[in-house]
Amino acid sequence: MYHPNMFESHHMFDMTPKSTSDNDLGITGSREDDFETKSGTEVTTENPSGEELQDPSQRPNKKKRYHRHTQRQIQELESFFKECPHPDDKQRKELSRDLNLEPLQVKFWFQNKRTQMKAQSERHENQILKSDNDKLRAENNRYKEALSNATCPNCGGPAAIGEMSFDEQHLRIENARLREEIDRISAIAAKYVGKPLGSSFAPLAIHAPSRSLDLEVGNFGNQTGFVGEMYGTGDILRSVSIPSETDKPIIVELAVAAMEELVRMAQTGDPLWLSTDNSVEILNEEEYFRTFPRGIGPKPLGLRSEASRQSAVVIMNHINLVEILMDVNQWSCVFSGIVSRALTLEVLSTGVAGNYNGALQVMTAEFQVPSPLVPTRENYFVRYCKQHSDGSWAVVDVSLDSLRPSTPILRTRRRPSGCLIQELPNGYSKVTWIEHMEVDDRSVHNMYKPLVQSGLAFGAKRWVATLERQCERLASSMASNIPGDLSVITSPEGRKSMLKLAERMVMSFCSGVGASTAHAWTTMSTTGSDDVRVMTRKSMDDPGRPPGIVLSAATSFWIPVAPKRVFDFLRDENSRKEWDILSNGGMVQEMAHIANGHEPGNCVSLLRVNSGNSSQSNMLILQESCTDASGSYVIYAPVDIVAMNVVLSGGDPDYVALLPSGFAILPDGSVGGGDGNQHQEMVSTTSSGSCGGSLLTVAFQILVDSVPTAKLSLGSVATVNSLIKCTVERIKAAVSCDVGGGA
C-alpha cells in the first residue's frame, strides 16, 4: 500500500554524487566568467596530466595576448566540459575545427576551467569548515560560561572544581567528537577536489532541520505548545517559571547523567528487566538501585515505582522520529491520547551541526488516561537529545522538581525515561521505549486501579503502540497506489484534507475527555447508575467550532466484554442505530473511507444518516476509529454537507465547525499483568469477567445555545445527562451485558 522509503530524509553529510548546475555552485556572470572566456597564452596552475602549460613558441618576455571567445564557442566548450573535463588530443582537435579555434586555445581553456572548478570547490569546503568551527567555538564558550557561573545548591557559594569534573569531561569528549567529525568531512571533501561537477559539494551545505514534519494532518498545538483548548491557568503548566541562570549547569548535569542511565537501561537485559505475560518488560527495582546508586535520589515517601520497557520496529525514518519527539507541537499531536497538554519553557540548546544532536529543552507536560476518573500526571522535566557514536539516537526526560522547592509537592516524578532509536534499512527504525515513574496513585478510581497498576495506562507499551499506529497512519496517508474500491477516496488532496479534519476532531476529543487540571468537571450523582461529569465552556471567534455555549458530558463504566468486541460494535455503521439516539433509528451508510494501516479498524469514514421517516439524507457524520495494543477510540462529529464537499475537493478543513463526541475503550487490567483482585466484586456474578472486560468512557459535546453570552439552563443539563445515560444503557443491552448498577 505504501513505499517503505517514503520517510527517507536528506542526510546532512551525504556525499552521493549529485548533478548540480553552475548556479547551484555559486557560478554567476562575474569576473571569473570573464576569466574563463579568455585563452590563448594564459598560464594555469593545473597540470594533472603532465601537459605543458605554455605555448612553446611563446617567448617569456613577450606580452600576453587575450582572445575573447564568442558566445557560441563558450556554450559549446561549457557543454563539452560537463561531459568530459579532460579531453584527449583528438577531441581537442575536433573541437578546434568545429569552433574555429587553435588546438592550444582549446587546451588552455580546459586547463583554466578545471583550475577554476578546483578553486571554487576549495572555497566551498573552507566555508563549511569555518561554519562548523564557529558553532563548535560558540558551544564551547556556552559550556565554559555555564561552568564559571555554577553555584553550590546547598550553600549558594561557588561550586568546587571537583563537582564540575563530570561536565568538563563530557565537554572535552563532545568537543573531540566534533573535531573528529570536521576532520572526517575535510577528508571526504579533499577526496572530491578536482572531480567533475557531478561530485559537487552541494550535499555538504549545513541546513537547519525543518522542525515541522508534515504529518498530513496539520499542527493543531498553538504557538505556545499547548494542545487542544486551555480552560484554566492555576496548574503546574502555568505556575512553573523558566529556569534561572544558576539552575542551568545543574540541569545540564542531570540531563547528561539521565542520558547515560537511559542508554544503559535500554541495552541491559536480565536481571535488570523481568518479562511478563503481556510482552512488556518490568523493572527489577532492587537491581536498579544496585546498578544506579546515584540517579536522582531515593524514592520519595508515599510514591510507588512504575517502570516498563517495550521495543518495536516502526515505519518511519529515525531522523523524523527525533524531530517529532523534540518538537512539542508534533509530539503532542502524535501522542494526543496520552499528552493532554505540553509546553516548552526554555530551549537551553538547539543542538549542533544543524540537527538535534545536543538539543536541551526544559518542559512541562500533563499525561492522561481518557477518563475523568483517572487524575492526570503533571511533570516538570528536561528533555535531552543525543546521537551516539554507533549512529543511534536517544531522547531522555528527567524530572527537575528538586529545583523548585517552593512548588507544591507533586504526585509524580519522572526518572530517566525516553527512547533509543536505531536506524534500519528502507526507512524503518527500531524503537526501545522506557517509562520510569514514581507516582502517588491513591486518588485513582477503584475501577481503573488494576489498569493503572498494571502499567498499561501510562507505561511503555501504550507509548510504543500509539507510535506504531501513528506511523502507519502517516504511511497510509502518503501512499499513492490507492485501490479504486467503492467509497475509497483516491484523490490525494481530498485524502489529505479529510485526514487533517479527522485529526483535529480526535485531538479535540482527547483534550476534553480526561481529568486535566484545566477542566472544571461537575459530578452529577444519580441513584442506581454511573456518575456523569459535566462541564461548560463558551465558544467564540473559533472557525473550527460552532459559536455558543457548549456542554460536555462524560462517564466511564465497566462491562465484562472484551475490548475488541466493544470496538467492533461501536465502529460498525450497521449497528449504529442500536445506540445512537440522534440517528432516530435510521439507516447509516458509509459514503467515503480512508484506511489508516493494515488493521481494518483503523480508518476515517464519512457516514450518511437516512432518517427513519424519510428517504432523504439529512445528516453527515465524520468518524475516525483507531485501535492498538493499548486501547481503542471511536470518535465522530456531525458535519455540514456543503463544508464536507469542499474538504473532499481538497479545500481547507480548518474552517469546518466540529463538536466531537465518542468513546474510549481500554482493557480493565485484570489480565496480563494487572491485579485482578480489585475487580473481584465486579466480576463475581459474571463468568466472562474472568477473561477480562472493558473500561468504556462515553463523552458527548452538545451546543446548547448559539449565543455565547447566554446562561445555561438546568433543563439543558438534564437533557444531556439523560442522553448520555440512555446511550450507556443501549450499549450495555446491545452487547448482551446489561449489568444494571453494578458498574
Curated annotation (Swiss-Prot):
Regions annotated as coiled coil: 110-192
SUPFAM superfamilies linked to this entry: Bet v1-like, Homeodomain-like
Function: Probable transcription factor that binds to the L1 box DNA sequence 5'-TAAATG[CT]A-3'. Plays a role in maintaining the identity of L1 cells, possibly by interacting with their L1 box or other target-gene promoters; binds to the LIP1 gene promoter and stimulates its expression upon imbibition. Acts as a positive regulator of gibberellins (GAs)-regulated epidermal gene expression (e.g. LIP1, LIP2, LTP1, FDH and PDF1). Functionally redundant to ATML1. Involved, together with HDG proteins (e.g.
InterPro entries, A to Z: GLABRA2/ANL2/PDF2/ATML1-like, HD, Homeobox_CS, Homeodomain-like_sf, START-like_dom_sf, START_lipid-bd_dom
Subunit note: Interacts with GAI/RGA2, RGA/RGA1/GRS, RGL2/SCL19 and ATML1. Binds to AIL7/PLT7, ANT, BBM and AIL1.
Keyword Lyase included in the entry's annotation: no
START domain sequence ranges: 244-476
Recorded superkingdom: Eukaryota
GO BP field: cell differentiation; cotyledon development; epidermal cell differentiation; maintenance of floral organ identity; regulation of seed dormancy process; regulation of seed germination; seed germination
Region described as Disordered: spans on this chain: 1-72
Induction, as annotated: Stimulated during seed imbibition. Induced by gibberellins (GAs) and repressed by DELLA proteins in an ATML1- and PDF2-dependent manner. Upon seed imbibition, increased GA levels in the epidermis reduce DELLA proteins (e.g. GAI/RGA2, RGA/RGA1/GRS and RGL2/SCL19) abundance and release, in turn, ATML1 and PDF2 which activate LIP1 expression, thus enhancing germination potential.
Name of this chain's protein: Homeobox-leucine zipper protein PROTODERMAL FACTOR 2
Basic residues bias (residue ranges): 60-71
Source organism of this protein record: Arabidopsis thaliana
Tissue: Specifically expressed in the layer 1 (L1) of shoot meristems.
GO terms, molecular function: DNA binding; DNA-binding transcription factor activity; DNA-binding transcription factor activity, RNA polymerase II-specific; lipid binding; transcription cis-regulatory region binding
GO cellular component: nucleus
Biased composition (Basic and acidic residues): 30-39
Entry's family note: Belongs to the HD-ZIP homeobox family. Class IV subfamily.
Phenotype reported upon loss of the gene: Plants missing both PDF2 and ATML1 have reduced levels of L1 box/ gibberellic acid (GA)-regulated putative targets, including LIP1, LIP2, LTP1, FDH and PDF1, in the presence of GA and during seed germination, thus leading to a delayed germination upon imbibition. Double mutants pdf2-1 hdg1-1, pdf2-1 hdg2-3, pdf2-1 hdg5-1 and pdf2-1 hdg12-2 exhibit abnormal flowers with sepaloid petals and carpelloid stamens in association with a reduced expression of APETALA 3 (AP3). In plants missing HDG3, HDG7, HDG11, PDF2 and ATML1, increased cell division leading to cell overproliferation.
The keyword DNA-binding appears for this protein: yes
Residue ranges for the DNA-binding region feature of this UniProt entry: 62-121
Keywords, alphabetical: Coiled coil, Differentiation, DNA-binding, Homeobox, Nucleus, Transcription, Transcription regulation
Alphabetical list of Pfam families matching this protein: Homeodomain (PF00046), START (PF01852)
